[in-house]
Amino acid sequence: MGRRKDLFFLLPLVIPLAPVMNPSRSLLSTPNRRIAAIAMLVLVVDQISKALVLQFLPNVWEEKTVVDGFFKVVHWQNTGAAWSSFTGKNGMLALIAIVALVILYFSRHHFNSHTLLGQFAFGLVIGGIMGNLVDRIVRQHVVDFIRFYIRLRGGNGEETGFPAFNIADSAICVGVTLVFLMTWRNEHAPKPVESPSE
């Protein structure tokens, strides 16, 4: 019941995306609608995946090995940012996320949003930020659960690997990478040769 009640915290984030649910127009009829639809999809998938982790791995630091020595599903709580930076600054990071969403919204036309790939990338970034923001508002921490690792030699059970992350983190990374690659391609694209005037 508590988890269902938590869903009400999604309303302030979902309401701005409501236009994409208007049945009188196509869901993907405009660039803004396509961006909003992708962001909504990322948000929903991210929150469902985290809810499943909390259901099947209810205890913090609990884990389930999927591929021994390579991949496991974990339940980690992160009150900071990537790589545990700014630990304990959940409120500040939530405020930064809100400011970032506002800035991104008003600067969306600078992110190649006129192209389908640009809209996809922008939607990934927006949805990823929203996914982790919901965590910070509802749970006061971000739930990380995807863990790739390798075992260290010595047989003492120690391991090393990439810090645990989630669907929202992945969406942000992929979106930012796509934006960077598109920007780089546009800057290095050959300029059209002007024909000499007669």
Question: Where do the PLM segments sit?
Answer:
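Alpha-helical transmembrane bundles and membrane-interface segments of multipass inner-membrane proteins
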Residues: 6-198
